Amino acid sequence: MSNIFTKTKLDLNQPLSPTQGLILLSSYPKSGNTWTRLFFYALQNRAKEIDLDHFAKNISTMDSQKTHFASVLGVDPNSLTQQEIAETIPKVQRYLALKSKNRELIKTHTANGEFGGTPTMDFSVIRAVVYIIRNPLDVVASFASHMGYGFDRSIKAMATSKNWLQAETKELRDEAPQVAQLMGSWSEHVAGWTGRPDPRVTVVRYEDLKHDTVVSFKRVVDGLGLRKTRAEVAEAVAKTDFAQIQAKEAKKGFTETVHKNQKFFRKGQTGGWREELSDDQVKEVIRHHAFQMNRFGYIPKEYHDFAKGVMIESQTAKHFIAEARRERQAQEKNIKRRSKPGKKNAGERPQVAVPRTSVMFPSAIKAQNPTNK
């Protein structure tokens, strides 16, 4: 990246034309986002074979690319704090929408919500979203390989609220092509994008893309309002067969790989967790994500009873937390009423037993409703 950071002259306050806007391909990392982008690349380039180098340079971009942040702010993106990144993401999205005359396909791993009071998405420029979700039990191993983590560390990262995707050292962060990306936990990410109905959002499971590929991709294409026949979709699917893509990466490499000695297109399997995760690790994933896993049919049959217990315990805890909050608010209101000037014993602050809990709320990431934007 150049050392000169020139701010765009584009007026970011101008309205979009009817032909402009963003189509987001959103997912938690290692959930099929790049494979889906390859599919769209094949769909747009019917006469061409898949060229990973050409694909990386010419099909879609990410809303976290440092070059976009430099254009919007005119400063070195490496100098930005997490709060500044969060505040700039919606501006980058508007910039990307305005700089193209047509609708732009954009990749994002950013959580849909708020950080420090700032919305992470500008839904006024987003025309459609494809949200790809994958069983977190399979994500664990793939994410661990991608980041160079062990499985336990991957599980912990996926369960961490306020989690940011970034390299570990400042040197690697400065060299990375993207700024840090706000993901939150796996459950926060899923809830933020799928928790409220929105006609613009098409949700597709990675497992359905793998096992009913043509039908599932046709549903995605139809959801975006693209006029493509089943035959055209099937042709694009054939060109992006996972084994073929793996062979191309093995021969020429792939620019989106984080670690040089590791594969980006690892296995692409469903159910691989059964051979990779221990019983304790499976339970740890379910313990953190039971509610969202249950919504999408990801809880293995043999763990149904365990997951049920987790969800009952969680709901009970939420009930007591809510009760404690209401009691604390009532007590604080009573204290203020007694402390008003002119009242008897004004200025006295009686000792009140305030219920305490180890649970911190609210979360730094709060799901926003796209339909209200």
Language-model segments: residues:
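Phosphate-binding beta-loop-alpha motif at adenosine-nucleotide cofactor sites
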Residues: 26, 197-224, 272-276
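Short, surface-exposed acidic
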Residues: 50-52, 225-235, 245, 300-303
